[in-house]
């Protein structure tokens, strides 16, 4: 159905008609000029992410439901990275004419899946038209007690550096998708050049080769915010001294922590958690797997520091790896290779010159 047939308000009503409030802090959600929230005993955390088609996602290989899920999860991840609990979400969309009502419903179904997983209320947003493509802007609102909030600037000399999950898989998943996309388009161009109509018809049923790489696809297409790690830390009585989520790459995030905390760091290549599929894919593509793990981005794992006294507790946690320690600023930022050589840790995350 064409969105113009039901209009903006009709679309909003259709998307939000079944929303049920999950949080006491949500006093009034969708349906008025503003949502009404109440946080009498907590600090309020607010984060926003903007995703643009052609810059942050490619609809050639991500479907709208997965896109909605990922768009929500990257915002929830920011709240977890502050040691908070996400409570509400607003969703704003700019849509070109090629998107139907059903397309938007599919996108929203992914957003709702993410929100249902972490008991988050969708309380508002906006829609508008776009001349080109799709733009998604999501704002997440969370809460935390003042004494529980973890900033980037709290790391101290001798603190341990930890990371959840594994690194580089999402980036290698992207490389896999790009490879298969290029294979498809090169075959299409070849068929067109030869005027081979039969080949073009067969390419309509093109099957990319993802065998043995399913985990990499999942990490790229279905990002997960690590709220489970926050729960484990709380249950273990561990309060990180500094924390970030790994969106631009481990190197970039760790250097942010060091800069804002006024410290140095020392991490060890052999301690970096890397999945087997990531290593195999890096070898296939003649890429350095350590570089992928350090700079790939979109892992949405948590990198955090804890006092050295929490070492025994950290060792007991599943899916958390100790990768190094914080040093005095004068010692710089060091990566120790598997053979003991020392290199300056550098960030290759997102920037405006990229």
Whereabouts are the PLM-identified features?
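Extreme N-terminal cap/leader segments of soluble proteins
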Residues: 1-63, 82, 91
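Glycine-/charge-enriched secondary-structure boundary and capping motifs
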Residues: 2-20, 98-121, 131-136, 141, ...
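Glycine-rich anion-binding loops of enzyme active sites
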Residues: 38-41, 87-180, 325
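Short pre-catalytic strand/loop immediately N-terminal to key active-site residues, enriched for Gly-Thr
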Residues: 62-65, 216-222, 241-242, 290-292
């Amino acid at each position: 159905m064409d969105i113009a047939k039901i209009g903006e308000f009709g679309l909003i009503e259709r998307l939000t008609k079944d929303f049920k409030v999950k949080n006491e802090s949500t006093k009034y959600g969708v349906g008025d000029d503003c949502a009404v929230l109440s946080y009498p005993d907590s600090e309020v955390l607010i984060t926003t992410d903007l995703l643009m088609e052609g810059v942050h996602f490619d609809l050639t290989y991500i479907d709208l439901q997965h896109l909605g899920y990922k768009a929500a999860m990257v915002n929830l991840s920011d709240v977890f990275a502050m040691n908070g609990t996400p409570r509400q979400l607003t969703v704003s969309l700019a849509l070109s004419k090629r998107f139907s009502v059903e397309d938007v419903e599919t996108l929203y179904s992914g957003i709702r899946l993410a929100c249902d997983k972490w008991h988050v209320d969708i309380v508002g947003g906006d829609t508008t038209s776009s001349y080109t493509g799709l733009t998604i802007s999501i704002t997440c609102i969370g809460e935390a007690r003042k004494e529980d909030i973890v900033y980037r600037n709290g790391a101290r000399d001798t603190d341990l550096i930890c990371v959840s999950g594994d690194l580089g898989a999402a980036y290698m998943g992207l490389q896999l998708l790009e490879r298969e996309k290029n294979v498809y388009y090169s075959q299409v161009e070849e068929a067109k050049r030869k005027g081979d109509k039969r080949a073009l018809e067969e390419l309509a049923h093109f099957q990319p080769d993802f065998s043995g790489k399913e985990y990499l696809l999942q990490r790229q297409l279905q990002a997960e915010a690590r709220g489970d790690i926050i729960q484990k830390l709380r249950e273990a009585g561990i309060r990180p001294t500094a924390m970030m989520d790994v969106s631009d790459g481990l190197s970039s995030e760790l250097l942010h922590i060091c800069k804002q905390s006024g410290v140095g760091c020392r991490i060890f290549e052999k301690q970096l958690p890397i999945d087997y599929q990531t290593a195999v894919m890096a070898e296939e593509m003649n890429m350095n797997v350590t570089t992928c793990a350090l700079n790939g981005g979109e892992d949405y794992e948590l990198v955090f520091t804890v006092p050295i006294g929490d070492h025994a507790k950290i060792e007991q946690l599943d899916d958390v790896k100790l990768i190094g320690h914080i040093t005095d600023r004068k010692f710089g930022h060091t990566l120790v290779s598997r053979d003991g050589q020392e290199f300056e840790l550098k960030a290759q995350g997102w920037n405006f010159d990229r």
